Amino acid sequence: ANVFHNAKTFYCRFDIRCSKMNAWRLDTQEQTVIISSNGGIPFIAYWDVKLTSKEDLAQLLDSFPQDFSGGVMDKAEYINFCPTSGDGFLGQPGIILHDENGIDILPNFKFIDAKKEGGMVFESRDEYNGLSIFHKISIHGEVFKFQTTLQSKKPINVGWLSAPIIPDFCSSEEFVQVSGNWTNEFCFDRLTWRPGVVVKESRSGRTSHENFPGLILLNKNTTNSDGSAVGFHYGWSGGHRMQIEELSTGQRQIQFGHSQSFKNALTQKISTAPMFVSKSSKGLNGIAQSFQSFVRKEILPSTLEKLPRPVHYNCWEAIYFKHSLKDLKEIAKLAVTLGAERFVLDDGWFGLRDDDTSSLGDWEIDKRKYPEGLAPLIEYVNQIGMEFGIWFEPEMVSPNSKLFKNNPDWILGKKNQTLGRNQLVLDLNIKEVQSYLFEKISKI
């Protein structure tokens, strides 16, 4: 069972003094996380293999003293969930704020309370600036879910807000960031830690192949099946930013948040997306299994969790925009002999879609290609034992389409903007757009 333990308050050596500390223990079947606070924002003091139930947390915390050297701040601290410049932190801060006049706000948070609310919620406050910050942690199998929420008594501008910041608790030697592009997805860039900051940001409003919101910490000898690995994923399909930093003290931190281009309006409450983290001692396969199990049990709708995944065939590369009922029937027959269980009709069946320069948004069957509609093809596909699927791209519109010509104000952005893939994006916040798409797609 997943367990949250609230240890009693105790005394232990943390920096060079004796400090009164709180500690909380979070357990999965294979991992233990110890969270502590010495009066400020909580921090992760331990994250590794599961500890015994009799582990002395005071003794454990006492085994993690900070080192001191010349030319640094006099008080050394662990990297907490949101280190701030107001605390004298000289690395990348976890929060950047300005008041209504653009003046910097340098928060100095004090720990207030920890509550069990669907997990653990840690509250810290800055009474002087009227700020409250909440760090929520919940357990999902072998995956930990982290999220930050900031509240302010007055409107402020948030230049940056990180999900709860995670230190490199496993002393990894390398990290893997994921990049790529179309037809070249999920390329692993395996890099060695070095002092300084690595920033990876998507400013395109989507996750993108170029800047996938994920990270893996590992050692040089970590393989698919053996060795230490920690996987991170920022659960946000829009613009995002990742910052990983090694400070001059040797400390390391991992930050994920929304792209800075999204933080330009005054607000009194803002939350990050959830960040999902899992540690494995069984290599890359271990974190893959943890995330896959989590997605199947808690992300997919319960109605889909145990359904079989049909092997499906997509006809795009076979025909592109040249649709013919005769050809598609022949292709479907070949597909079923190969073991396909679902046949998917891709782009080119609607509007006057003979190439990628027109008709997106005109979700009506092209009678030139399908004079009797799609029924003959669907019936044939079902008859030979396959499900039938069909391709839509409802959020997009072609400038050369009836939809755009009749409703040029339904797009995101200005009318004379640079196109991407010969298309524009519909503003799905507009009720008329929602109604139009629902009507057209449900009719098909």
Positions of the model-derived regions?
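Polysaccharide-binding surfaces and accessory modules of carbohydrate-active proteins
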Residues: 25, 31-33, 42-246
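Conserved, mostly hydrophobic/aromatic
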Residues: 30, 148, 267, 313, ...
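Catalytic domains of carbohydrate-active enzymes, especially glycoside hydrolases
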Residues: 327-349
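Active-site-adjacent "subsite" loops/lids of carbohydrate-active enzymes
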Residues: 310, 317, 321, 394-444
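Aromatic- and acidic-residue-enriched carbohydrate-binding clefts of CAZyme catalytic domains
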Residues: 349-377, 401-428
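Hydrophobic faces of well-ordered beta-strands that scaffold small-molecule active sites
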Residues: 311-314, 345, 388-392
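Short Pro-Gly-centered flexible turn/kink motifs
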Residues: 106-109, 262-281
